[in-house]
Amino acid sequence: MKTIQPILTITGSDSTGGSGVQADIRTISELGGYAVSAITSITVQNTLGIQAFFDIPAEIVSGQIEAIMNDIQPSIVKVGMIRRVETLEVVIDALTKYRPDYIIYAPAIWSSNGDALMTEDVVSQIRYRLLPLCSVVVARKKENDIILQDTKLLRMAEGNGMQVFLLDNANSHGLTNRFSSALAVYLNQGKKMEDALAMAQDFINVELTRESNLQGRSSELYNQFISQVNNFCRTYSDVHFYADQL
């Protein structure tokens, strides 16, 4: 039996399952890979957006990564949401120490609803300390413009072998998660970078045709409201009538 080399994902937790470590594990498993994880932050969120964060202490993040890297030794590491400078420092220390074959970075600067996920201090440290270690950056355009706003920096990073892959459909929740996780699986299978990127794009194209089954209470109320309007619009125009129906 062929042994599957695990893929380490270092990122936050999304309680809706649409992004974060949940989306990484689901995508990696769906494509036949095996995911191990280190959690950087826990979000309180639903379909309306993020209500709160709990950032895992840096020493605990470090302990998670060290335990996995020292024992299981994954050759591919995917890095996602990092909100604090001290967390970024322990991630960089571990990546520098263990030097995995591929480091895939999917920046999480804003949520799909536009919530800020990190400060400028973290962004600055990412530019000059994390990017030089990365094999590929998978980003939405607006995040790429922030992370790689310095043309000289981009040339230096690309000179070190880093590639940048930009994704459209910027408002699709968890898009960079799923793409970068798929990319990790294909690289883990021994595919060349160009082939792995193309296969990950094909995977995402199929994913985008699928409608999410996740529906919050606000969507349910909206659908009920539209149904009532269709049924009674010729009879009632008072908004209070429709509010009573809900």
Sequence positions of predicted segments:
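Glycine-rich phosphate/adenosyl-contacting loop at the front of the ribokinase-like
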Residues: M1-T43, F241-L246
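Charged C-terminal helix
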Residues: I4, A52, D195-L246
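Short, small-residue alpha-helix embedded
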Residues: Q22, N171-M193
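Phosphate-handling active-site elements
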Residues: L31-V36, Y186-A200
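A short acidic, helix-capping loop that chelates divalent metal ions and anchors anionic groups
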Residues: T43-Q51, S111-A116
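Glycine-rich, highly charged phosphate/nucleotide-binding loops
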Residues: A52-N70
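Conserved beta-alpha-beta core of the PfkB/ribokinase-like small-molecule kinase fold
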Residues: I76-L153
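Conserved phosphate-donor
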Residues: S135-H173, D195, Q201-R217
